[in-house]
From Swiss-Prot:
UDP-N-acetyl-alpha-D-glucosamine binds at residues 93, 122-126, 307, 329. One of its GO terms (cellular component) is cytoplasm. Phosphoenolpyruvate binds at residues 22-23. The keyword Magnesium does not apply. The lineage of its organism: Bacteria, Pseudomonadati, Chlorobiota, Chlorobiia, Chlorobiales. This is UDP-N-acetylglucosamine 1-carboxyvinyltransferase. Pathway: Cell wall biogenesis; peptidoglycan biosynthesis. Its EC number is 2.5.1.7. Gene3D superfamilies: Enolpyruvate transferase domain (3.65.10.10). It comes from Chlorobium phaeovibrioides (strain DSM 265 / 1930).
């Protein structure tokens, strides 16, 4: 198993390019299942564990692909199976993205429930509701979602989401792209990754209006065509790298970005005292002498993203005062707090709100990753901690960050990946 060993106290400086977005890559790769012929060529796909897992799932279904230097070539013309087994789905919740494309293409689909998935007010319910609104019959049997169409093809319909869901919006769009007739989705997620999926489906041949808004209308087509497509940048990786510069008192320029998609995060950095400038597709940040506390509330786009709240919490441990962090998407997404406190942070939880008391002098020690973004927060804390920090179980980090230690090293961080035996 791998760990990251960090010698803290180095100011990060330099210029680095942002990677392609994982959160847009996954639904786009799933959408290739909608075309029964030809070859897709997808650019700027990040080299991540989650991408490899998703490719394995598509290979199991019959797809063929080749991935090299950020370019993924994929053909789904030989896909015959519409059954996604538990052995593959359990590795990643985003595997549910194959439900809509398989159902739309074959008229039936069997997709294992993601591991540990409990029903009730969970996002998976919204995926199933969307399929039913398009005319599917859904049953849950022996741990599988079994979906069938009643009229050969899915039928366009009205989908009104009670809450915003990126995953359910993506699945609904993909299913509607091959449905007969027009589908309107209200309270749709408006995240840039959904916008990218809309452009991808439209380029395949399914017209979509309302792109970038919470109301989407999509015209279904009987067939869709393979295309060449350029992926968008990863705004969460970009925010994490900006936080790395800010927490170490450094300065950084990110290239190949879209500042418009990061307004809430850039505004938070500005309020913290950082100097933020944008120029075309680049973002520059210079850390101040003393960071100011900034309260944030994680909500659907264009508000502050939930995938950045753990990193922001690490940053606020160095701010001159108390900050409040609220997550209205995942109310209890605070697994990183005990580990940050082990490093010397002073963070309390009150009424599903984190109270960060800063500034605190952090001291390096061993800490345990619990999930993707929690891992990133521990790396950020390690960059500013005195002494050596060991971040264990970095396979979580590898799910969503493309060679993060190499990028940080290029900016001046003293960080290296090492093997370790968890049970020794």
């Amino acid at each position: 198993m791998d760990k990251l060993v960090i010698q803290g106290g180095t100011r990060l400086e330099g210029t680095i390019a942002a990677s392609g977005s994982k959160n847009s890559s996954l639904p786009i790769i799933a959408a290739t299942l909608l075309a029964g012929t030809g070859l897709f060529r997808l650019h700027r796909i990040p080299d991540l564990k989650d991408i490899a897992t998703f490719r394995s799932l598509l290979h199991h279904l019959g797809a063929e692909s080749h991935f090299e230097d950020g370019i993924l070539e994929i053909s789904t013309s030989k896909v015959k199976s519409a059954r996604a087994p538990y052995e593959l789905v359990k590795k990643m919740r985003a595997s549910i993205y194959v439900l809509g494309p398989l159902l739309a293409r074959f008229g039936h689909a069997e997709v294992s429930l993601p591991g540990g998935c409990a029903f009730g007010p969970r996002p998976i319910d919204l995926h199933l509701m969307a399929m039913e609104k398009l005319g599917a019959t859904i049953t849950i049997k022996t741990g599988f979602i079994e979906a069938t169409t009643n009229k050969g093809r899915l039928q366009g319909g009205q989908i009104d989401f009670p809450v915003s869901s990126v995953g359910a919006t993506g699945n609904a769009l993909m299913a509607a792209a091959l449905a007969e007739g027009t589908t309107t989705i209200t309270n749709a997620a408006a995240e840039p990754e959904i916008e990218a999926l809309c452009h991808f489906l439209a380029a395949m041949g399914s017209p979509i209006t309302g792109i970038g808004t919470t109301t989407l209308t999509i015209e279904g087509r009987p067939t869709l065509q393979p295309i060449e497509f350029n992926n968008v940048f990863d705004r969460i990786e970009a925010g994490t790298l900006l936080a790395a510069a800010a927490i170490t008192g450094g300065s950084i320029t990110l290239t190949d970005t879209d500042p418009e998609q990061m307004q809430s995060v850039l505004e938070a950095f500005t309020r913290s005292g950082c100097t933020v400038t944008t120029n075309g597709h680049s973002i520059s940040l210079k850390s101040p002498g003393a960071l100011q506390p900034v309260n944030i509330t994680a909500e659907p786009y264009p508000a502050f993203p939930t995938d950045m709240q753990a990193q922001w919490m690490a940053l606020m441990t160095q701010a001159e005062g108390t900050s409040l962090i609220t997550d209205r998407i995942y109310h209890e997404r605070f697994n990183h707090i005990p580990e940050l406190n082990r490093l010397g942070a002073h963070i309390d939880i009150t009424d599903n709100q984190a109270v960060v008391h800063g500034p605190q002098r952090l001291s390096g020690t061993k800490v345990m990753s619990t999930d993707l973004r929690a891992s990133a927060s521990l790396v950020l804390a390690g960059l500013v901690a005195e002494g050596t920090t060991e971040v264990l179980r970095v396979y979580h980090l590898d799910r969503g960050y493309e060679r993060i230690e190499e990028k940080l090293r290029r900016l001046g961080a003293r960080i290296e990946r090492q093997k370790y035996d968890e049970f020794s």
